[in-house]
Amino acid sequence: LAGVNSINWARVLAQIVYYFSSAVSLGAPSRKVGFTVPTGNFGDIFAGYIAKEMGLPIDRLVVATNQNDILNRCLTGNGYHTTEVAASISPSMDIQISSNFERALFYAYALDANEIAKLMDQLKQNGGFDITNAALSALSYHYSSGMATEVETSNTIERILSRSAQLLCPHTAIGVKVADDFRDHAVPMITLATAHPAKFPAAVKNCLLYTSDAADELCS
């Protein structure tokens, strides 16, 4: 509990707040809203699951990943099996062991701690594990998923900057791209912005076909 990283339970609890705040601003609880969350460690989107269980009318929670898409592969029925990590312009997602996904599995396996311990042992010993159909069904009930390639991420940064003068960090751009894939005009979709673009200046500038004054100012 000392480090305020994504596995810290206090951080997950704090993240619940902005699900309620943003949903209420768009009409909740009178209307449902959706959330797309760029994530590698599953902490931010797990906070959304808790918010949903607390009664927030969330239509869907969408996991957005980069090319290191172990979460997307898992949630689309291909098991949780690690592969070699490929360096990307969204480095916070360049992982294969998602530290908070164990918490989601715990609920998907009906609070069976012994079964989760076995899965974690398989992950340690064999680099992955398969998920039962029942658990996958439970996960799919709460979570959808999608991914964005490097080119799609760069194109999204460029498109949003050109259209609205908003400069996105690569992780947020992945969320926006995946949110577009899941867009339902009857239900508003909120994409969580995970970092300021100035945190990744080289990656952001390399994504742009041109360097705007806004990009220079924000990334300097």
What do the PLM-derived regions correspond to, one by one?
Residues I157-L161, V204, T211:
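A generic alpha-helix structural signal
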Residues L1-A2, V33-G34, D59-V62, A165-Q166, ...:
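Structural motif
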Residues F46-Y49, A173, D213:
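A broad detector of short, well-ordered amphipathic alpha-helices
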Residues L168-P170, A186-M189, F200-A203:
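Extended hydrophobic-aromatic, low-complexity segments
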